[in-house]
Design a protein with these regions (language model features):
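Bacterial N-terminal signal peptides that target proteins for export
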Residues: 1-9
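N-terminal segment immediately downstream of the Sec signal-peptide cleavage site
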Residues: 23-72, 167-168
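Short, surface-exposed binding/anchoring microloops in extracellular/periplasmic proteins
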Residues: 51-100
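Hydrophobic residues positioned within well-ordered beta-strands of beta-sheet architectures
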Residues: 78, 104-106, 138-140
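Extended low-complexity, serine/threonine- and proline-enriched intrinsically disordered segments
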Residues: 91-115
Length: 168
């Protein structure tokens, strides 16, 4: 009876350690990144000085509010309010404070490894409608690499130029 009890305890201990480990990297719903702010592209990054290989939009942008998340299963949620062309030069006066782009997308950028070498993976989402006031909601998925180190989320044009990035 004592042996049975020890065997049962041992089996339960192994199961308790092994079952959570099976979920690591298996596409579970854990948050990889959770953000409450995005920063609009500014003059030094409009066209020149790409971040992780991604070029900023051609003019400065500003954003009123944002939040979003990336989960281990690849689900990407981004909500932006007031993502518009900056209200200052060099943006033409008639475009300041407006969004001329009808759809926004997102790119999740991870540092990862391929064949033992460090590399960057930029994963584009589908696009979603954006209002002229710069409001949009994306709820989509990407195939995250494993590992996915130092994730960054960019809000982009349909062509992939970024307008806002996770950060301040």
């Amino acid at each position: 009876m004592k042996r049975f009890g020890l065997a049962l305890v041992g089996t339960l201990l192994v199961a308790a350690l092994a079952i959570p480990a099976l979920g690591i990297g298996s596409g579970d719903g854990r948050k990889v990144l959770d953000f409450k702010t995005l920063a609009g592209v500014t003059a030094p990054y409009t066209g020149a000085n790409p971040i992780r290989g991604l070029t900023g939009g051609g003019l400065p942008w500003e954003i009123a509010d944002a939040n979003g998340s990336v989960r281990a299963d690849g689900r990407v949620k981004v909500e932006v309010e007031g993502l518009v062309l900056a209200r200052r030069a060099p943006v033409p006066t008639n475009l300041q404070g407006t969004n001329p782009i009808p759809r926004f997308g997102a790119i999740v950028s991870c540092l990862t490894t391929v064949g033992g070498a460090a590399t960057t993976a930029n994963l584009a989402t589908s696009t979603a409608p954006a209002s002229s006031a710069g409001d949009a909601e994306l709820d989509t998925t990407v195939n995250l690499p494993s590992p996915c180190f130092a994730p960054i989320v960019f809000v982009t044009t349909p062509g992939g130029a970024w307008l806002a990035v996770s950060g301040l």
